[in-house]
């Protein structure tokens, strides 16, 4: 299978890798679409402070389930899914308080661990989300859209109100 490897800052190449095998409780996914986030650009440029090399970037994606290792009453081969791209330890102070976004040991796909710029990848079933009826192209952007949705909800913006977008770089554009 092919993957995009950022070998060193500023250098990327398409490489052939062995297809991964899902562990028990994991699914093998075929990536359908992958978005390019600002963190992917930072990883390529060498300005992402947490990236190590070589690294396969990417965390915004949609995929089709190819195979499931084990039983699942939620998913089947052929389902189109996306996934939570952040892996928390669940035991640190932040996680115990429900603040998983502040996990002391977070591993983000494409930064701390290989990401979605590859044809196939494995993912724990408990991280997957089906989105029946959603176009896979749109599903690949659910993570950046959810950030905007969260901001609007948190600010309690009401219909008809105006908002100002204070910053719109390539990282914030959808």
PLM feature spans:
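Short glycine/threonine/proline-enriched tight-turn/helix- or strand-capping micro-motif at secondary-structure
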Residues: 11-18
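NAD(P)H dinucleotide-binding glycine-rich loop of Rossmann-like/cofactor-binding domains
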Residues: 89-164
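Short, acidic/hydrophobic/Gly-rich beta-strand patch recurrent on exposed beta strands
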Residues: 5, 44-45
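Residues that mark the start of a beta-strand
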Residues: 2, 26-28, 162
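Residue-level detector of conserved catalytic or cofactor/ligand-binding positions
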Residues: 165-174
